[in-house]
Amino acid sequence: MKIRSVDATWLRVPIPEGRQHTSDFGRMRSFDTVLVRVETDSGLVGHGEAKAGVGNLGDGRALVTLIRDELGKQLIGRDAARIAGHWEEMYNGSRAHFAVERGHVFPALGRRGLTISGISGIDIALWDILGLSLGKPIWQLLGGKCRDDLAAYASGGWAPAAGIGEQLAGYVEDGGFGAVKMRVGSADGDTLISAQRVEAAR
């Protein structure tokens, strides 16, 4: 089962103005992601997802080019089931032989940030292909189920000190969450403001 093609598409979904929010990363005006598509010579197609920036911010064009023209081209004609080996080679580039010979990773420069995001999208697509080829869900391939349910927390908490307590309590009361994560940091503009918001939340 050889890899025939690797492609990527930037998806941008505008967020209605009333549902936008501002974080440390800026105003969230759209949800951006890159859809990765890996096709094999057997006809199986796997899909993955990669992010161009933290908090869904960022232009997806560079990530699409990276996946399609650099990372993806390394994989054409290769065995789609050799997932760990492909990850190692994409991450370490021309230095992959060090990892194979010595048994440990040998990171090359420039293999973080955007590159690791691109690798992740391809990696997900390859796992998708493996699952399809075996007729198994990916969670089984990764070791199986550990529990029947998983606790979730609410993420948000952007309100100023005067309203943060009410906002966080709403997540618990209205959403049924047992825990919440509030945001503090550069969006506050001053660490004193962050401290006041945290104190008010308590």
Named regions from a protein language model:
Residues M1-G55:
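Structured beta-strand/loop patches that form or line metal/cofactor-binding pockets in enzymes
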Residues S5, E39-S133:
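Metal- or metallocofactor-binding catalytic centers and their adjacent structured scaffolds
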Residues P14, H104-A108, C146-D149:
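A short alpha-helix capping/helix-coil boundary motif
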Residues T22, R111-G113, A152-A154:
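A short, structure-level motif marking secondary-structure boundaries and short turns
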